[in-house]
Amino acid sequence: MTGADGTYDYKAMAAGIVLAGGEGMGNLLPVVEKELLHYRILDAMMREGFFSSLVFQGGTSLRLCHGSPRYSEDLDFAGGTSFDMDTLKGLGSCISDSLSGMGDDVTVRVKEPRPDADGLTRRWRIAIRTAGQRKDLPSQTIKLEVASIPAYEPQHRPALVNYPICLLYTS
């Protein structure tokens, strides 16, 4: 599942996870693929220091850090009441570089929040497409949101290893 350039093939890894899961897991392939992308994005954010000003929360946090069985779509964060967008300069390119590094056939588009956006939440929209993907299927899309709200009891928790095969491909 590792390419000649040292990247891993997340689609092959997801297929292996679904196959190992047994009958009835076939419909979950896109969900498992998205969860592997979540791991990759969170790893890149941690390596670049973006978690110093953010608290991971929401459904994906419950699944990846607290063991919830429910799959979730998006990545949600609390940035605090004094959240400053400047602390996240470079987040889009960090995500794009990390996901593009998964192979030559991976195309990543990150839509950044509008600089003049009002409100409490800033949203990045991440679209991932692979060359082998059928044109009639949509890209994997992940929304990353940062809300200007406090996190009342933040805890440092590692992401759980939902798929032991992933341990073979960590850098």
Language model features with spans:
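Conserved small/polar residues in nucleotide/adenosyl-binding loops
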Residues: 169-170
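N-terminal regions immediately upstream of nucleotidyltransferase
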Residues: 1-36
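Catalytic metal-binding acidic patch
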Residues: 59, 67-88
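Conserved catalytic core of two-metal-ion nucleotidyltransferases
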Residues: 99-142
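Short gly/ser-rich loop at a beta-strand->alpha-helix junction or flexible surface loop bordering the NTP-binding
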Residues: 53-61
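Short, surface-exposed, charged loop/turn segments at secondary-structure junctions
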Residues: 159-165
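A generic, well-ordered mixed alpha/beta core segment in the N-terminal half of proteins
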Residues: 83, 87-99
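Alpha-helical phosphate/pyrophosphate-handling elements in metalloenzyme active cores
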Residues: 46
